[in-house]
Amino acid sequence: QLVDAFRMKDGTAITPDKESGYSTTNYADTKSGWVFAPAGTRNMFVNREPRFYVNICFNGAYWIGDQKTRIQLYYTGGSGKKGTWDFPRSGYIAIKNVSPSSNPKNSNYIKRPFVIMRYAEMLLNYVEALNEYDPGNPDIETYLNLIRERGGLGPVQSDLNQNQMREQIRLERRIELCFEQLRYFDTRRWLIADQTDGGPFYGMNVDAGNSFTDEAFYEKTVFETRVFRPEFYLFPIPQSEINRDPQIVQNPGW
């Protein structure tokens, strides 16, 4: 879901047609404009928006700050299922906030402060609330576009209604704040977790592949099936608390 949420470099959503420029087949003949996508990169990873390349490491990408080492996520690769015990089950590696000086192979990790809140989250909180309270307010586009511009995209479409703008804000929030421990809470307060947090989750086929161009690795494959039930929107009240006050009513489903 997350990998597919990142758009193309012109801001269009990825769709399997010529208009979007997205393709799930074949490989780039030349190096793209992004340093992480060398010649030979699968086309599905080429010409995506800049934030894709600083958040997601895909099969064949250069490692952070290294223009020589291409990450091998296919089955027999160095970072694949056969090559290491801690391979990524989805076929992707999260690299947000990873320092170029880090070297996991040598257990050399660069410490960074934990970010509690940053400016982009404040802006996204503001435009989300404003869109619910006063749809059409010009501040919505102004501050949403600040985030998009910093992320390398053009301005949001200007004639969106409230529902359409809500979807754009939520998408922007998902991309900009990914891997920042917020998505879990967002899907629950929006009451969409029953649609997004359960069912099959897809990735690359980590049980196949002997090279960067092995077609079998790129087959969309279920790597995990999750369960989300309506009662999961709320945590159960501890029985010890209910015992202390019999008037407390347990949350639904628990």
Cite the ranges covered by each PLM segment.
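Acidic/polar-rich alpha-helix caps and helix-coil junctions
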Residues: 1-254
